[in-house]
């Protein structure tokens, strides 16, 4: 069962269709919803986009190729704003303090995480960073 019942329609319908396609891909290991939909503050449809963090194996190195590879899954809809990372890139993003990813993991909603990648990543944030207001500060290790 997907954890998306809290998402308002028609966003939920679009999210459900896209998530269904994503989890059918063998390389997709985790999906996180973040941004206004995850926070329960979407603008009227279609002003908000559906922000997703997708963790997958075997992604193209080139960011443009990466986006083009999965573009057909969107059926031409521009409502999806997704970030695709490998598990290793996710670790590097946390260690390096990529604010968007730190915020996504802290305030987002885990939609699909059978391998506990997002769960482990969320716990790792506090190992490396402290949040002061809206700013992430790297801890001295």
Language model regions located:
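Catalytic core of pol beta-like nucleotidyltransferases
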Residues: 1-27, 38-46, 57-141
